[in-house]
Amino acid sequence: IPTNAHQAMQAAAQFGVKPVIGFGWSSGDGIPDLASTSEPSNNSFTNMETRQNFRAMVAAFAVQYHPAYLFLGNETNSYFVTHTQAEWLAWVSLFEECYDAIKAASPTTLVYTVFQLEKMKGLGKHAGWTYPAHWQIIQDHLRNGKIDALGFTSYPYFEYQTVAQIPADYFNMLTSKLQ
């Protein structure tokens, strides 16, 4: 368990707040840090040692802290757009394994992942992005029911220069895309 996760839980207890803890594994560009001793050239979620270590870490965190909220991966669609379909599905399967391990230790923990909204929509010209919209990957997570929520980061300035340019219904499509 990373030291900063322990520190966050200690600070939350000290100040009486309910923390939202997340375990990320890549840069905002989708470049992961998943290599291991046994597979140093495999920087993907097909790396068996990495999968085992990540699953064990989140399970240990759930056993020790029983968090109310726990998200695995931040802006995970950045991984989708930079990796193969097989590598993406390996992440989804690991997420589901982690979900089961977390729920076994802490049944009430809300477990979810986070996507980057502008990238998901196929926007981001000011960030240099040219990715097509990829809403379908949400269904990869919803298919087996092993996810409690979805989170999104949003930076409209990646596409729009002024607030006035942002469509009034900018966030409305989320409800239709999540059904």
Residue ranges with predicted function:
Residues F71-N74, V92-A133, Q179:
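Aromatic-lined carbohydrate-recognition surfaces of secreted/lumenal glycan-active proteins
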Residues S41-S44, A127:
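Short, compositionally biased strand/turn segments
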Residues R51-F61, K125-L142:
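Short, acidic/polar
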Residues N43-M48, H83-Q85:
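Second-shell loop/turn segments in exported
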Residues S27-I31, S78-V81, T113-G124, F152-F158, ...:
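Active-site clefts of carbohydrate-active enzymes
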Residues I1-P40, N53, M57-A59, Q85-Y112, ...:
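Aromatic-lined substrate-binding rim segments of carbohydrate-active enzymes
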Residues R55-W88, Y112-L117, P156:
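Active-site groove signature of glycoside hydrolases
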Residues I1, Y65-A68, L72-N74, F115, ...:
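Aromatic- and acid-rich polysaccharide-binding/catalytic face
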